[in-house]
Amino acid sequence: MFGFLSKLLDSNEKEVKKYRQIVEIISALDVSARKLKDKEFVSHTAELKVLLSQGTTLDDILPRAYALVREAANRSIGQRHFDVQLVASIALHNGKVAEQKTGEGKTLSAIPALYLNALTGRGVHLVTVNDYLARRDAGWMGPVFSLLGLSVSAIISDQSFIYDPSFENQEALDWRLKHLRPVSRKEAYAAHVTYGVNSEFGFDYLRDNMVSDLSQRTQRGYHFAVVDEVDSVLIDEARTPHIISAPDTEATHKYYDHAKLVEKLSGETDFVIDEKLRTVHLSDHGILKVEKMLGLGNIYENDFQIVHHIEAALKAKALFHKEKEYIVKDGQVIIVDEFTGRLLTGRRFSEGIHQAIEAKEGVSIQQESKTLATVSLQNYFRMYEKLAGMTGTAVTEAEEFKKIYDLDVLIIPTHRTMVRKDLPDSVYKTTRAKYAAIAEDIGESYKKGQPVLVGTTSIDKNEIISELLRRKGIPHNVLNAKNHLQEALIISEAGKKGAVTVATNMAGRGVDIILGGSRKETWEEPDKKKWKKGEEEWQKQHDEVLAVGGLHVIGTERHESRRIDNQLRGRSGRQGDPGLTRFYVSLDDDIMRLFGGEQVAKLMTIFKLPEDVPLEHSMVSRAIEQAQVKVEGFHFDSRKHLVEYDDVLNKQREIVYKRRTDTLEGEDQKETIILNIQSEVENVVHMYSDERERMIDREKILTEFLSIIPFDSASADQLLKQLEQLQTSDEMSSFLKSLVRDMYLSRETQVTPEVMRQVERWVSLSVIDSLWMEHLDAIDDLREGIGLRGYGQRDPLVEYKNEAFIMFERLMTTLDSEISHRIFKVQVNMNPENAQSKGVSLSEKETAVTKALKHMKKNDGAEKIQPVQSNKQPGRNDPCPCGAINPETKQPYKYKKCGLINAPYHKK
């Protein structure tokens, strides 16, 4: 890793120097840009678009485009790009990760690159980490794009907006949100520039591949994306697949039963926890104990579902802790993001873990779910033709960015020299001694008026520090996922003189703490006299905080990742401000306990240090950093492994979604379906024929044929007589294949070609969706158990690839077979008058084929397409409201299995 970093740093300087030369060209165009009238910016944008259409490249027009943006930003929002911000933006245009320190203005840096690439008319995306930032940045930068003649939008959970200067939201408290007008998802994606949350881009991609009509699609391609906080999105969240699911079966008491059962198990004798791998399993003693409590023999042979539920309950008990991995709010278990400290409302742990936690906490258990569609962020963002990113901390993960995403990291110089002091770690033997030292340090800073930001890793530790400060009589603000609604207010005051803020990782990323407190912009205070007075007051407070040393950042423990620690440090020392940072560590901290605290413990023993005396030495800092490098390497391998496995499913997903898109686009499937049915029939004939023995089982051939094309008993008898007159399997196969084609064409004439194309599309979509869903479940089961192959000296990944390939081949074969078996079972009820008006003769000459067609079964195996009258949405396992009957069971189709599940008739 260190060799990789040294190469990176060597090439970094050369690249920055090259980009600075381009910035000089941009700066030379400043004079002409300043002479432009406001209305002329739009015409210059139009000129650049024309140049592109004539073959000029983006690189050719970059200096002119960037000069326009620089001037437009200065005029519209009063912010002019620094040279280093233009360097960062050139890096973004070239598909790199730009590492910019806190306060260097990443939001503004992205604008020139977004503008330049949006000139192609293909749409560009700015990806953020939460709803607030997506809306804020779209509204904040909206005036810049508007002056340049481009549209800008924002997509967040369940809502979309477009920047519209003529629209005003009177309820918006933040001036940057006032001109965001609600629009449809499709209109938001049609904008030149779209800001949005990473998860919503992924979910919209999945939803677009589940629609029943092309007009329902929202996204329009994957041209260029700039990912803000790129390390958080592409690395921290990469291990979490994005899943769209639907309720499967009703929740039962089994989770409560197993939660009670594991409460009787002891961690000392009954189960084994591996905190590094985050796994837990029963010991031999525990297995015997569980079998005795359940009154069963071998639970691993009797019912694997029991083992699954017990292990889920064990994980809920041993690995998932309240106020750390989740909180309970309003009777619901809500996940807390381990990297950002924010609530992930609406997301759920998979594999029954969430239900097991709900049972543990005694709240209502929500239904289990079945995966409808899934994609990892790694594979979603790799679909973009060009990808770039911004963050304050990328260099430690440069190797991963290169190997997985083929992204180079460029370290952007700061606008002003960094003067912050980063003190060495203070290491204590116990957590108690560490907390006492932290409280003492906070007290000293508070006395002299220095603002303090205390970073904790979880809500419970956040509240422990808060209680210590309360006892010492130190006023403070607490920021965690429980009171996230006050975040903006708390952060705006965190830089004031004497302010003490205790926060989780929420304050470690994307947060700008301004010394002296947040200042009012001219947009917020239109009265210039009042604004000037407020500005003078702010400057006075700002200078007072500078005099006492700037923001003091205290980390209460080291995180597994150096990036998260660096993010916390980065809240201090913005834009050349002074600042101070220090981390406090104890031997009880997770990282010391799991990844290398033994070396530090030995040092403390050698020096014979008492509990309340810290160890501060470069050897200690190196030991802690080595522990973090170990963890980062472990997680890198895990994510690389995830990509290798997910790539297998990704290729399959692309093939299935391509087939689904072709179906939606109205590709004529008639000939393909006829050939598939003929192939099915041919296979049936050969299956029940033995030419050598001169044995042909005509009755079984007929039975199988009728499962594809259902006849009434009289027509079936007539068909059997015809089969008995044929001597060889080839004759029989040829006759039945001809019959299939004639019946298909006759049916098409009967219902009209337009309706037949709709039937083909509905049946194909429903079969694809249903079987793809089952395939995802099967692949998930394969993935879970494949690791055991390693014990047999076989490579699990190779085994997974081989078996997944076989399963996929089976899926594609089954798709064709299912469509063949369903297409003739759809009976279209047409109004005779309408049929006549469309030129369909209802009294056409009856041939043997049309006679057989008229006698097809009308109930058994025939699905009648008709409007659903009930307003109640049926459950997945309820009988389908369309009344379709399964010919095999003679029972109504379940809603989830019905061939018409995507037909508009199923909608209210």
Model region roles, listed by residue range:
Residues P874-C880, A884-K908:
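A short, cysteine/histidine-rich metal-binding "knuckle" motif
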Residues A110, I438, K864-P867, G875:
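Active-site-adjacent structural elements in folded domains
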Residues H81, N871-P874:
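Residue-level marker of regulatory loop/turn positions in helix-turn-helix DNA-binding domains and
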Residues I327-I334, T340-R347, Q575-G576, F583, ...:
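Extended, charged helical/alpha-beta scaffold domains that provide interaction surfaces
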Residues M1-K608, Y657-K658, L675, S679, ...:
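Conserved P-loop NTPase motor core
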Residues G449-N462, E665-E667, R692, K721-E724, ...:
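Short, Lys/Glu-rich amphipathic helical modules
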Residues V454, V502, W772, F808, ...:
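Hydrophobic, well-ordered secondary-structure elements that form the walls
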Residues R64, V84, R136, D460, ...:
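A generic structural signal for residues located within well-ordered alpha-helices
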